[in-house]
Amino acid sequence: MTKPKTKNVNDFSRCLDPLDMDATLIAVIEMSQSSWLVAGIVPGVEREPLKKLAIDEHALLNLLNRWRAEAEKQGHRITRIAVAFEAGHDGFWLARWLAARGVEAHVIHASSVAVTREHRRAKTDRLDTELLKRGFLGWLRGERGHCKMVAVPTLAEEDAKRPSRERETLVGEASRLITRVKSAFVRLGIRGFNPKLKAAATRLETLRTPEGEPIPPNTLAALKRDLERHRIVKQQIREIEQTRLDVLKQAPEKGPHAMVLLLARVIGVGVETADMLVREVLSPARD
C-alpha cells in the first residue's frame, strides 16, 4: 500500500490551494521608484484592466475593491483576492500590509519568471505586467515552471538579518579602505608598513619614501582620514559582534538562537558565521 503524498508547505514553486477563476480576483504589480502599474484579471469582465498608480498602498486597496465591485456586478462573488509582485528594493512591507487586510499577497522571485525570446527583445511596462500575470496565473493553477515565490518574512525576521548583513558590508568597507591605503604606499614606494596596526595613523608622519622625502601633505591628510574611517568601521564591527553575543546570552534557547549556538559548537564556526547560516541559508523565510 502506497503512502499518500503530503503537501510540502515550503514548496514555493506552485500554489497548493485550488483556484476558482470565477471567485478569484487576480492582480500583479509592476513596481518602479515613482509608480505602480497594476494589471488585473477580473471575473466576468472581458477587458483586462491596467492602472497606473502613485506609490500608495491605500490607492491600491481601493483599486482592488473597485475591481471586486465590478466582478460582483457581473454576478461573481469574490472570495479571494490574490496579488503578486516581484521581489526587489521595495522589500516585503506591502505584502504584509495587504495580508493584514485580507488580501492574499505573494512575492515572486525576480529571476524565476519564464521569459520568451520575443519578450527579451521587446521590453515595455505592458509586456512586464503580461509576463507577471501569465506566470502568476500558472503558479496559482498549481503548475510548475511558471515562477517561484519567496517566503514573506515578518518584520522581526527581516530585522534579525540586519546585523549579519550590516557586518558583512562593514567588513567589505574596512577591506576597501586598507586596500586604498596600501595602494597609496605603493605609489610612494613605501613598503613593509602595516596600516592595520593601532598606531598606524600616528606613525604616518615618520615614514619616508625611498627618495628620503616625507609623505606629501595632501596624501598624508587623505591617509589619516582613511585610517580614521577604518578605525570607526572596526569599532562598529566590534559593537555588532558584542550585541550579538549579548542577545544570545540573554535568550540562548529562544528560536534560532539555539541553532546558532549548536552550529557554533558542533561544526566549529564562529558565532557570526553560524548566525548568517541560520538566518540566510537554513531559514525557510530566507529571501
Q: What annotation goes with each model-predicted range?
A:
Residues M1-D287:
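A detector of single, family-specific signature residues
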